[in-house]
C-alpha cells in the first residue's frame, strides 16, 4: 500500500480559521458521545429573544476535523460503535480472519434466528444507541431554539430518541449502519429529518488509485456528504472498498452488481445468482451499510424501455436487462429477493431499491417503463419489511421541472412512505459542464416535496470521472439544495443558520459571514481576491467591493 497524501487530513483552520472547535454531546440512554462542530461568532446576535455567541453545526467530517485525534489512514479510524457494546448477544464471528488493513477485525453476523436490524429493534420498542445518536445529532444542541420556532401554527418540538424509533418502525426513515462498520457515526435518512446528500466516488477501468478514492471519500465527508457510494468498476474493487470503509465516518453504499460483473469476466450473460450472492456476503462482511439492488426491472418492462429515446441508462439496469434477454429468464435479483433480504438482515444492511429504468433524458420522464418499475419497487418494499430490512427507494434521473412533483407523489403512493433517494433530478439535458447546478435545481424542488436524500452530481457528469475538486463542487452545490429544501420545510436549525448569516451580513461581520456559509474557504478566497484587486487589503470595512463605500444599501439603511 502506498503512503497516503497529507491532503487526506482536514484540520479545521483550513475552513474556519480559529473560530471552530469539535464538541461532543453525551447521551442519556446509552454511553454515546455525538460529535458536532461549534462555531464561535465575533458578535453576539439575538434571534427570537435568544442570544447566540456561537452555534453548533451538524458535522459529517467525523474525527478528521478533530485536532485531538491522531489518524493513520493505514490503520483506519477508531471503532466508535464497538464501545457501545450493544447487540453483542445477538451476533457471532464469521471467521477468524481480519481485514486487509493493519487493524485486525473479525467480521460479525447475526446468530441464527436473530435479527440485528434497526427496524427489528424499533418494532420491538427498543431504542438503540444509533437512534439516540441521530436524535441528538439532528437537534444540534439547539433544543431551546427549536422549541421557540413557530411552524404550522404551533412551535416546533426537538427530536427525541422515541420519535426516531417510531419513524424507523414505520419505515419512513432508515439508519444505515452495518454491524461491521464500527467506525460509522450514525445518521438518519427520512423526510421528517434534515435532507441528506450522497457523494459518489470510485475508480473505473480508465484510471484512479486506491489512495485517490480514499482521499475523495474523506474530503466528501469534510465538505458535507452524509453518505458516500463506492461505485468502483476498475481494478482492486475489494481493496478500494476496504480502505474506504475503514476510513469512513459516514455510511458507505455500493452497487454489488459491479463487482459481480468483474468476477464474471465483464460478461453480463455469465452472471449467476450464486456469484452475486457470494459478492453480497463478501461486501456485507466488509461493512457496507447499504446496497443498491436493481430487483425491480422485469422482463415485462423491457419492451417499453426499448421504445425510449435513450433506452436504459442505469449501469446496473442495463446489465440485468442484457442478462434477462440473453437467458430468456426473469431477473434473478427479483426471483431471489427473499434470500437477498435474509443476507441483509444478518448484517443490518439497508437496501436501496435501484431505479434501473430511471429516465436518461427529459423526453423519457414519467413514462410507462419508469412507473412500471416503481410499482414493483413498492411490492419489494413490503417484502423487505417482512424480513426486518430497512428500505429506501431510488429515483430519477432526468425530469422536466413540471413533472418533478408527480415523481414524489407517485413514490409516496406506490412505495408506502419509504424514504426517497434521487439522482437530481436533472431538469434539462443541455447543461454539460454545469450538470451539478442542473441537478441541484431539480433536487431542491423534489426535496421540498419530501425526498429524503439527494445524490450529488458533479461538473463532470456525462463527461468523465470526477476528481477531488469536482467532488467538492458537487457536494457543496447539493448542500445548498438540501439546505434550501430544509428551509422550505420549516427546519428550525436550518433557519437559524440563515438568520445568523443575515444578521452578520447587516453588521458587516465578515468572518462570521465566511464561517456561516456552506463553503467558508471559497467565500474567504473570493472576498480576499476582490479586495486585493481594488487595492483594499487592510481591515474589515463596512462595505464590499460590489457596491463600494458610497453605494452600500445596508450601510445607508443604518445611517441616522
UniProtKB/Swiss-Prot annotation:
Q: Which GO terms describe its biological process?
A: thiamine biosynthetic process; thiamine diphosphate biosynthetic process
Q: Which Gene Ontology terms cover its molecular function?
A: 4 iron, 4 sulfur cluster binding; carbon-carbon lyase activity; zinc ion binding
Taxonomically, which superkingdom? Bacteria
The EC designation for this entry is 4.1.99.17
Q: Could you tell me which Pfam families the record lists for this protein? A: ThiC-associated (PF13667), ThiC_Rad_SAM (PF01964)
Binding residues for [4Fe-4S] cluster, per the UniProt record?
A: 544, 547, 552
Catalytic activity annotation: 5-amino-1-(5-phospho-beta-D-ribosyl)imidazole + S-adenosyl-L-methionine = 4-amino-2-methyl-5-(phosphooxymethyl)pyrimidine + CO + 5'-deoxyadenosine + formate + L-methionine + 3 H(+)
| Uppermost EC category | lyase
Positions of substrate binding: 200, 229, 258, 294, 314-316, 355-358, 394, 421
Q: How is the cofactor bound?
A: Binds 1 [4Fe-4S] cluster per subunit. The cluster is coordinated with 3 cysteines and an exchangeable S-adenosyl-L-methionine.
Q: Which GO terms describe its cellular component?
A: cytosol
Gene3D superfamilies in the cross-refs: 6.10.250.620, Radical SAM ThiC family, central domain
Binding of Zn(2+) occurs at: 398, 462
Statement: the UniProt record of this protein carries the keyword Iron-sulfur: yes
Q: Does the keyword Thylakoid apply?
A: no
The family database entries (InterPro entries) matched by this protein are listed as: ThiC, ThiC-associated_dom, ThiC/Bza_core_dom, ThiC/BzaA/B
Keyword set, alphabetical order = 4Fe-4S, Iron, Iron-sulfur, Lyase, Metal-binding, S-adenosyl-L-methionine, Thiamine biosynthesis, Zinc
Pathway assigned to this chain's UniProt record = Cofactor biosynthesis; thiamine diphosphate biosynthesis
Cofactors: [4Fe-4S] cluster
Q: Which family does it belong to?
A: Belongs to the ThiC family.
Annotated function: Catalyzes the synthesis of the hydroxymethylpyrimidine phosphate (HMP-P) moiety of thiamine from aminoimidazole ribotide (AIR) in a radical S-adenosyl-L-methionine (SAM)-dependent reaction.
Question: What name goes with this protein?
Answer: Phosphomethylpyrimidine synthase
Amino acid at each position: 500500500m502506498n503512503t497516503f497524501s497529507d491532503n487526506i487530513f482536514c484540520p479545521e483552520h483550513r475552513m474556519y480559521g480559529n473560530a471552530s472547535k469539535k464538541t461532543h454531546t453525551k447521551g442519556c440512554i446509552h454511553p454515546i458521545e455525538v460529535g458536532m462542530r461549534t462555531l464561535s461568532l465575533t458578535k453576539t446576535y439575538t434571534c427570537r429573544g435568544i442570544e447566540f455567541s456561537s452555534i453548533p453545526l451538524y458535522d459529517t467530517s467525523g474525527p478528521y476535523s478533530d485536532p485531538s485525534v491522531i489518524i493513520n489512514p493505514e490503520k483506519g479510524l477508531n471503532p466508535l460503535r464497538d464501545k457501545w457494546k450493544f447487540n453483542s448477544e445477538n451476533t457471532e464471528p464469521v471467521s477468524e480472519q481480519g481485514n486487509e488493513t493493519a487493524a485486525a477485525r473479525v467480521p460479525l453476523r447475526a446468530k441464527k434466528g436473530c435479527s440485528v436490524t434497526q427496524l427489528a429493534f424499533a418494532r420491538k420498542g427498543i431504542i438503540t444507541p444509533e437512534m439516540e445518536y441521530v436524535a441528538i445529532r439532528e437537534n444540534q444542541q439547539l433544543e431551546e431554539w427549536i422549541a421557540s420556532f413557530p411552524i404550522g401554527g404551533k412551535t416546533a418540538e426537538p427530536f427525541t430518541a422515541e420519535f426516531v424509533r417510531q419513524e424507523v418502525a414505520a419505515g419512513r426513515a432508515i439508519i444505515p449502519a452495518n454491524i461491521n462498520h464500527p467506525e460509522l457515526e450514525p445518521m438518519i435518512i427520512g423526510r421528517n429529518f434534515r435532507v441528506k446528500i450522497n457523494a459518489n466516488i470510485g475508480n473505473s477501468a480508465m484510471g484512479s488509485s486506491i489512495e485517490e478514492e480514499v482521499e475523495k471519500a474523506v474530503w466528501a465527508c469534510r465538505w458535507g456528504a452524509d453518505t458516500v457510494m463506492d461505485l468502483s468498476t476498475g481494478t482492486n474493487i475489494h481493496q478500494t472498498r476496504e480502505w474506504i470503509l475503514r476510513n469512513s465516518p459516514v455510511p458507505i453504499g455500493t452497487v454489488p452488481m459491479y463487482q459481480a460483473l468483474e468476477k464474471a469476466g465483464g460478461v453480463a450473460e455469465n452472471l449467476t445468482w450464486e456469484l452475486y450472492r457470494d459478492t453480497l456476503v463478501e461486501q456485507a462482511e466488509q461493512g457496507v451499510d447499504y446496497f443498491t439492488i436493481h430487483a425491480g426491472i422485469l422482463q415485462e418492462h423491457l419492451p417499453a424501455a426499448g421504445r425510449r429515446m435513450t433506452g436504459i441508462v442505469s449501469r446496473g439496469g442495463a446489465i440485468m436487462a442484457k442478462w434477462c434477454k440473453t437467458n430468456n429468464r426473469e431477473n434473478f435479483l427479483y426471483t431471489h429477493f427473499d434470500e437477498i433480504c435474509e443476507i441483509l438482515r444478518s448484517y443490518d444492511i439497508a437496501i436501496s431499491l435501484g431505479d434501473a429504468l430511471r429516465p436518461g433524458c427529459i423526453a423519457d420522464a414519467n413514462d410507462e417503463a419508469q412507473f412500471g418499475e416503481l410499482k414493483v419497487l413498492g411490492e419489494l418494499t413490503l417484502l423487505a419489511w417482512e424480513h426486518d430490512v430497512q428500505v429506501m427507494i431510488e429515483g430519477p434521473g432526468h425530469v422536466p421541472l413540471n413533472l418533478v412533483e408527480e415523481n414524489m407523489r407517485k413514490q409516496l403512493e406506490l412505495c408506502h412512505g419509504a424514504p426517497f433517494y434521487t439522482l437530481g433530478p436533472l431538469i434539462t439535458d443541455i447543461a454539460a459542464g454545469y450538470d451539478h447546478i442542473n441537478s441541484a435545481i431539480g433536487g431542491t424542488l423534489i426535496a421540498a416535496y419530501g425526498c429524503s436524500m439527494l445524490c450529488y452530481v458533479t461538473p463532470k457528469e456525462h463527461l468523465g470521472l470526477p476528481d477531488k475538486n469536482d467532488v467538492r463542487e458537487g457536494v457543496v452545490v447539493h448542500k445548498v439544495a438540501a439546505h434550501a429544501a430544509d428551509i422550505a420545510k420549516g427546519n428550525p436549525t436550518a433557519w437559524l443558520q440563515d438568520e445568523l448569516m443575515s444578521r452578520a451580513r447587516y453588521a458587516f461581520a465578515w468572518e462570521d459571514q465566511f464561517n456561516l456559509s456552506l463553503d467558508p474557504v471559497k467565500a474567504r478566497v473570493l472576498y480576499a481576491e476582490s479586495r486585493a484587486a481594488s487595492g483594499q487589503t487592510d481591515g474589515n470595512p463596512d462595505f464590499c467591493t460590489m457596491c463600494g463605500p458610497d453605494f452600500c444599501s445596508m450601510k445607508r439603511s443604518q445611517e441616522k
